[in-house]
Swiss-Prot record:
It comes from the Bacteria. This is Uncharacterized protein aq_950. It comes from Aquifex aeolicus (strain VF5). The lineage of its organism: Bacteria, Pseudomonadati, Aquificota, Aquificia, Aquificales.
Length: 120
């Protein structure tokens, strides 16, 4: 399974054609399936590893409402209620760093589904 590069959308706009939203302090960090020609600098060049499902399936599933919990060394950074059809501009308490992990919880037909996400 290939990793996905992080990219930044300055306006914080969510585009349904393959963008997933990850929260970062004062910014919106995004990744997308298709390649973007301009990568971010420093930590924003991190790669995202999605376990258990393909990146395409992951992006498709996060279009539904769910919770994204950011973890660092097992410690909870922030939990956000996400509706990826909206323009979300919430803030995370800390910057996203290499090694950070996220757990995405999706509510799907009365069933909770969990996906592990890691910043490489």
């Amino acid at each position: 399974m290939r990793s996905l590069n992080f990219y930044h959308v300055c306006t914080g706009l969510f585009e349904s054609c393959g963008y997933a939203l990850i929260m970062r302090d004062c910014d919106s960090i995004t990744f997308r399936i298709d390649e973007c020609p301009v990568p971010l600098l420093s930590i924003k060049n991190a790669y995202l590893k999605v376990n258990e499902i393909s990146p395409e399936d992951f992006v498709d599933r996060i279009k539904h409402s769910g919770y994204l919990s950011m973890l660092r060394k097992g410690e909870l950074i922030k939990t956000l209620e996400c509706d990826f059809n909206l323009n979300l501009r919430k803030k995370c308490e800390k910057n996203l760093e290499k090694g950070d992990k996220a757990i995405l919880i999706i509510h799907e037909e009365k069933e909770l589904k969990f996906f592990d996400i890691e910043v490489l």
